[in-house]
A protein has these predicted regions:
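C-terminal auxiliary extensions adjacent to catalytic cores
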Residues: 2-23, 27-34, 38-46, 72, ...
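Glycine-rich, flexible loop motifs
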Residues: 2-42, 46-49, 76-135, 226, ...
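Polyanion/phosphate-binding surface patch
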Residues: 50, 65, 252
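FAD-binding core of FAD-dependent oxidoreductases
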Residues: 53-67, 71-75, 82-105, 135-157, ...
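Conserved, non-catalytic sequence blocks in retroelement Pol enzymes and Pol-derived host proteins
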Residues: 111, 140-142, 377
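A broadly conserved amphipathic alpha-helix scaffold signal in soluble, globular proteins
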Residues: 120-127, 147-154, 216
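Cysteine-centered functional microenvironments
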Residues: 134-139, 319-323
Length: 514
């Protein structure tokens, strides 16, 4: 199936489908007319005598240097090659494809002055399976993500490096094997390809999609943990959350009620329970997860807008027949969104770790065995798994420090305030991975705890989650190499097995309905 790419029809659900699957794409042909008009304006300006940034001038601090007409084709190639200064591990292939799709979307809005064939070159590269090698370090998020996007543009002209059928090749060799001719860049085209926030936006969007999955996983796992320690469901009463009014909080409480409905464990201690109130990590789950969900929703609105934005400079105003300089390349909105996502991930992991600690502590777990193991002493059970969760939680807290406030001047002070969006968005991959491992440990503990309550049973939906877990990881009856268990469960969470079994696999568009 071929997916049509148009800025007028994409949304986060569509982009998730593009991100999760290697789909063939085609740029909406109806966009070609406006793109052609934009390119024509640039061509005319290139033939004139007035200086136009990026068309007949140098770049950055060198913008006052006028470039002779005979050197302007070389100017664009030089721009791409000189800006291929990124280092570090390459961007994951699925995120690279997402970045290229976002670049297509931005260019196809017809305000960047590129040829239609240049946009189609990106389309051809995506559909061929070529993945440009994009080093993840080198962008400060203004003027756009210059270095990462330069590495993408380099492959388009037969330079740089790319992966094709699992093999790392030169850009030229990758194109040759795929039957694609390198293109020659016209006036402004190199600048249009490099200027933009698509690296930062792709990283932030991919991380947002994973963060949404994490919130849903957390709702399921925290509900199971609540049952494991025989926590009260009274704090989930709808009246409590409606009195406060936060949409995320109301949503989380509602889903937890649905998941825990029918739990025999819960009914067994509804009356005559001497505990008046549960610890905050149980009682305040809707408040903490709900606040995290709300801040992710804020980030999703920003990212959704940015996926359909023109973040080039200068911009071509087709209706006014002119080219203007601006600052849409500054990725401050994405920098803020990335910091918001980081805060949410850190907090979700923090409260998850406290639930793990609660379940393994026999003085707090309401008669669960020490460290959730039989014959404690001979067996250590989940003792060190809990320590691992604490280490991951602490790392995520450190990674959650804001990046957007860490501006530094670059390019001889011409670009004197930057967003640091690229680093802010890229670190989210590590945070999501850490969080998934914390959840893996909590799910192992919660399932073990619920099973320790037998013959009492948890709710049907939560039992489905436990049953799905046990298809892949057996109960810990005696000590074994537990790292494998954690990795296996993290993989299940990645694949949404637990969400599907508990009927909570909801699309990210649910955000906008809260």
């Amino acid at each position: 199936m071929t997916e049509i790419i148009s800025p007028h029809s994409i949304n986060l659900d569509f982009l998730e489908k593009i991100f999760r699957n290697k789909l063939e794409i085609v740029v909406d042909p109806e966009l070609e007319t406006n793109v052609a008009k934009s390119y024509e304006i640039v061509q005319k300006s290139a033939e004139g005598d007035l200086p136009v940034y990026g068309v007949n001038t140098g770049f950055g601090k060198l913008a006052n240097k006028i470039i002779p007409s005979e050197d302007r084709e070389q100017l664009q190639k030089n721009l791409v090659l000189s800006h291929c200064a990124g280092i570090g591990e390459p961007l994951p292939e699925d995120v690279t494809r997402l970045m290229m799709v976002l670049k297509i979307v931005s260019l196809s809005l017809g305000a960047s002055g590129v040829k239609w064939s240049t946009i189609k070159q990106i389309e051809r590269i995506i559909n061929s399976g070529i993945v440009p090698e994009i080093p993840h370090q080198g962008s400060v998020g203004a003027s756009g993500d210059l270095a990462p996007l330069a590495h993408m543009a380099a492959v388009m002209i037969g330079e740089g490096f790319a992966f094709y059928n699992g093999e790392k090749l030169s850009g030229f060799e990758a194109l040759k094997k795929a039957g694609i001719e390198p293109i020659t860049l016209g006036p402004k085209e190199g600048l249009a390809l490099l200027n933009g926030t698509q690296f930062s936006t792709a990283c932030a969007l991919a991380s947002l999609l994973d963060a949404w999955r994490s919130v849903l996983n957390s709702i399921v796992i925290s509900s199971l943990s609540t049952d494991a320690i025989m926590g009260s469901t009274s704090p989930l009463l709808p009246q409590i959350h409606e009195l406060r009014g936060h949409k995320g909080q109301i949503f989380v409480a509602s889903k937890m009620r649905e998941l825990m409905d029918g739990s025999v464990i819960r009914e067994s201690h509804r009356e005559n329970d001497q505990r008046v109130q549960d610890p905050y990590c149980i009682r305040c789950q809707p408040q903490v997860l709900g606040a995290s969900l709300d801040i992710l929703k804020n980030a999703s609105v920003t990212i959704d807008i940015e996926t359909k934005a023109v973040t080039d400079n200068p911009l071509v105003l087709v209706d006014e027949n002119k080219i203007v300089s601006g600052g849409n390349f500054h990725a401050e909105p994405i920098g803020f969104a990335a910091d918001q996502i980081a805060l949410a991930l850190a907090e979700i992991g923090s409260i998850s770790q406290r639930r793990i600690a609660l379940m393994v502590d026999p003085t707090l777990s309401y008669d669960l065995p020490p460290f959730l193991t039989d014959d404690a002493g001979l067996n250590s059970g989940f003792m060190i798994a809990e320590v691992t969760s604490a280490a991951l939680m602490s790392e995520n807290k450190h990674l959650a420090n804001p990046c957007v406030t860490d501006s530094t001047p670059t390019s001889a002070n011409q670009e004197d305030h930057v967003s640091m969006s690229a680093h802010g968005a890229y670190r989210l991959f590590k945070m999501n991975k850490n969080l998934n491992s914390i959840f893996g440990i909590e799910l192992l503990c919660a399932a073990q705890g619920v099973e320790s309550r037998q013959p009492l049973k948890t709710s049907p939906l939560l039992q489905n989650a436990v049953d799905e877990l046990r298809k892949h990881v057996p109960r810990l009856n005696e000590d074994r190499f537990v790292a494998n268990d954690i990795n296996n469960v993290s993989n299940l969470l990645d694949k949404k097995n637990i969400l599907k079994s508990s009927k909570l696999d909801l699309p990210i568009s649910t955000f906008f309905n809260l």
